[in-house]
């Protein structure tokens, strides 16, 4: 549990077959970037490239400078493997045949 003036934050990164959930305590006023750095997720998963990957809080994409609130979950999103528009076309073509 967080003491007053501290934020209890979860940092999450998911791979196929593996999910990393790290809990950190940060001072009030900390940002999404602070949480990523404090959690060690970037060292644990060196494949994370924040110049290509988005970060979010509870499914909403945010910047690394976004202030956090107690109980927030910071998520690192992997790049899409297939364009969603192309995937819909493929499914429609399979269904039609």
Swiss-Prot record:
Q: Which residue ranges run through the membrane?
A: none
What domain of life is recorded for the organism?
Bacteria
Give the family per the record: Belongs to the UPF0125 (RnfH) family.
What is the name of this protein?
A: Protein RnfH
């Amino acid at each position: 549990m967080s003491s007053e003036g501290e934020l209890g934050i979860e940092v999450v990164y998911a791979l196929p077959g593996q999910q990393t959930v790290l809990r950190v305590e940060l001072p009030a006023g900390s940002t999404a970037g602070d949480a990523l750095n404090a959690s060690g997720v970037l060292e644990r998963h060196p494949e994370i490239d924040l110049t290509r990957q988005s970060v979010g809080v509870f499914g909403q994409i945010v910047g690394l400078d976004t202030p956090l609130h107690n109980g927030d979950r910071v998520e690192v999103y992997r790049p899409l493997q297939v364009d969603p528009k192309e995937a819909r076309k493929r499914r429609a073509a399979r269904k039609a045949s």
